[in-house]
């Protein structure tokens, strides 16, 4: 990877945030890691990341959706991955299987938390086309 890609990572779980940020930095990415929707919105106002990975539910149940909407409104070309443990915690299946769902939510990909960091990086590379 010759270009250094910037990943905006927003999650209110400090352990998950640390683990993913550590792995992505080790893989050569610049990572801007924040713990809240408000912090992520401040980052979006100041810079354009190459890709974003948002927790679906942070301080509110729809934080990830709101961040996705705001990022895509400002930078429509920036891919967004929503990562969540909703299915594991509630048993409710959530996904972005149809184009209609992805268009409404504006996320490019949905991943269940617990995905291996290597798999997350593979998905990031696919979305960045590297």
How would you describe each model-predicted region?
Residues 10-11, 34, 52:
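Conserved sequence signature across two-component system core domains
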Residues 11-12, 113:
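Acidic di-acidic motifs
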Residues 47-54, 58:
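Active-site beta3 strand of CheY-like receiver
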Residues 14-32:
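Two-component/phosphorelay signaling modules centered on CheY-like receiver
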Residues 1-6, 112, 116-130:
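Non-catalytic signal-transmission and effector/linker regions of two-component phosphorelay proteins
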């Amino acid at each position: 990877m010759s270009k250094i890609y910037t990943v905006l990572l927003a999650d209110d779980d400090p352990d998950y945030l640390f683990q993913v940020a550590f792995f992505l930095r080790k893989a050569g990415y610049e990572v801007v890691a924040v713990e809240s929707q408000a912090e992520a919105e401040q980052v979006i106002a100041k810079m354009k990341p190459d890709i974003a990975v948002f927790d679906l539910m942070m301080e509110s149940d729809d934080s990830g959706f709101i961040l996705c909407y705001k990022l895509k409104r400002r930078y429509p070309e920036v891919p967004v991955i929503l990562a969540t443990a909703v299915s594991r915690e509630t048993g409710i299946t959530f996904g972005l299987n149809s184009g209609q769902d992805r268009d409404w939510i504006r996320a490019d990909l949905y991943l269940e938390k617990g995905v291996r960091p290597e798999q997350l990086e593979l998905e990031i590379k696919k979305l960045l086309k590297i």
